[in-house]
UniProtKB/Swiss-Prot annotation:
Domain Core-binding (CB), first and last residues per copy: 57-161
Tyr recombinase domain: residues covered: 181-362
Signal peptide stretch: none
Taxonomic classification: Viruses, Duplodnaviria, Heunggongvirae, Uroviricota, Caudoviricetes
Annotated keywords: DNA integration, DNA recombination, DNA-binding, Hydrolase, Transferase, Viral genome integration, Virus entry into host cell
Protein's recorded name: Integrase
Location of the active site: R215, K242, H314, R317, W340, Y349
Gene encoding the protein: int
InterPro entries found in the cross-reference section: CB (IPR044068), DNA_brk_join_enz (IPR011010), Integrase-like_cat_sf (IPR013762), Integrase_catalytic (IPR002104), Integrase_recombinase_N (IPR010998), Tyrosine_recombinase_XerCD (IPR050090)
């Protein structure tokens, strides 16, 4: 029998019906269990070769293969998070047994993970201080969250069918398309009010975001070696950008002023905390430390004090883009400044500056044969007649 051991783990090694050699760890230290797995694998290989059956694959096996083949993905951590959710429902299940009904049933149970994490921190803090922790109430996940999880399992099962030949037919999964929400942006006076309500270092981060349009992760992870103050430029490396392309950032005077205030705070990171804080477990954090891009407590407090609602940090990027478009910056230039991969992603700002369409809109005037008088002039004339 082609069964051997390396260290304490048993391995299977045998020749497949097509003449190829099969060798695989059986993942067990027990010889009897290893023998059973060996015989099962050998029998399955014979059925696949002689009877044309599709080999069985567990959901865990598919996930492991996916992670191995997609190891280069920048968003691999996102895939791992989605795998974690689906494993709660399909662990130990054969791919062929995963149906559309089971998938849709599982996705309805997904909840807002950030909401749960925040509650756990609150619960831990309350218990430590001898207080009664709040009752946890699950918060439904957003449509966009459900869509990304469905897109992942759809891609995984398609790969199992089309690439790995481990599935006869993948389930047909319809992914909901989140509605395009309006672009949320601030008027200059609102932005100034928000900045005034922010405390350092958040204040500098917000100012820098409004002056450069950079994403929060790019700002928080910005290093001094990525900045040339003399040339007034900064750059985001390809592996740091969403589009996987390097982004050159032209630094205006506002951005340079913000950067100069950060000089001397840290040898590596541009934006850092300079005061110690108490962690949920009661320990103290270092006085000078890198900022967290997912810390929202100070941000939410500043929004509340400024009286600004329905506004995310990423909307600062929308605000920056909206201001530039309204100032006459061409869409193509904005695309390059913001590092967007396609022009389609920038067109959502085009409606904010329709001035280039005015000449075309005037073609209707020729149909009526008359020009419309200036509205302000008409109002003045009416006021004179009434007098």
């Amino acid at each position: 029998m082609s069964l051997f051991r390396r260290g304490e783990t048993w391995y299977a090694s045998f020749t497949l019906p097509n003449g190829k050699r099969f060798k695989q760890s059986l993942g067990t230290k027990d010889k009897r269990q290893a023998t059973e797995l060996h015989d099962k694998l050998k029998a399955e290989a014979w059925r696949v070769s002689k009877l044309g059956e599709t080999p069985d694959m567990t959901f865990e096996g598919a996930c492991v293969r996916w992670l191995e083949e997609k190891a280069h993905k920048k968003s691999l951590d996102d895939d791992k998070s989605r795998i974690g959710f689906w494993l709660q429902h399909f662990a130990g299940m054969q791919l062929k047994d995963i149906t559309e009904t089971k998938i849709y049933s599982a996705i309805q149970k997904i909840t807002n993970r950030r909401h749960e994490e925040n509650w756990k921190l609150m619960d831990e803090a309350c218990r430590k201080n001898g207080k009664q922790p709040p009752v946890f109430k699950p918060k439904p996940a957003a449509v966009a969250t459900k869509a990304t999880h469905l897109s992942f399992i759809k891609a995984l099962l398609r790969a199992a069918e089309r690439e790995w030949k481990m599935l006869d037919k993948a389930p047909i999964i319809k992914v909901p398309q989140p509605k395009n929400k309006r672009i949320r942006w601030l008027e200059p006076h609102e932005a100034k009010r928000l900045i005034d309500e922010c405390q350092e270092p958040l204040k500098s981060v917000v100012e820098f975001a409004l002056s450069t349009g950079l994403r929060r992760s790019n700002i928080i992870n910005l290093e001094w070696q990525q900045i040339d103050m003399q040339r007034k430029v900064a750059w985001i490396h390809p592996e740091q950008s969403k589009s996987n392309h390097a982004i050159g950032v032209a630094l205006n005077d506002t951005a340079c002023r913000v950067l100069k205030k950060q000089i001397g705070n840290h040898h590596k990171w541009v934006f850092v905390y300079k005061e110690s804080s108490t962690k949920p477990d009661g320990t103290k954090s270092p006085v000078v430390r890198k900022m967290r891009y997912d810390a929202n407590t100070a941000w939410r407090a500043a929004l509340k004090r400024a009286g600004i609602e329905d506004f995310r940090f990423h909307d600062l990027r929308h605000t920056w883009a909206s201001w530039l478009v309204q100032a006459g910056v061409p869409i193509s230039v904005l695309q390059e400044m913001g590092g967007w991969e396609s022009i389609e992603m920038v067109r959502r700002y085009a409606h904010l500056a329709p001035n280039h369409l005015t000449e075309h809109a005037r073609q209707i005037d020729s149909i009526f044969g008359t020009s419309v008088p200036n509205m302000s002039h008409s109002k003045n004339k009416e006021g004179t007649n009434n007098t």
